[in-house]
């Protein structure tokens, strides 16, 4: 199975990884894992004076902070995983990557906001569900 794990470094990411760890059938060399972290692009005044190379380094460093404990999780279990930093609209970037990689499943944590909050503000999980053609498993 080709599994994409969308991570953001939040406690919900930790819960998702915990769920994967507790369910042995999710782990193993028979699966292919891609771990993605998506960052919205810096725009406006903050981005205008920054060298594009420096900006890419900033995005990469932020993603590495999120990836570090997850990379350790996979390495401790002897499981290979591909780590990808995406820069763009978060939900759209995650959904497109899952489709591009022909993933069988996209797994992500969810904050579990209520209907009203999602209706007014939206959420990454809600947007991924709406825009992704790949099956999505939300862990709360």
Predicted regions and their residues:
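Glycine-rich, Arg-bearing micro-motifs that act as flexible, cationic patches
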Residues: 105-130
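Short, flexible loop segments at boundaries between secondary-structure elements
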Residues: 134-140
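Conserved acidic residues
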Residues: 1, 104, 133
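General small-molecule cofactor/ligand-binding pocket signal
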Residues: 34-36, 82-86, 137
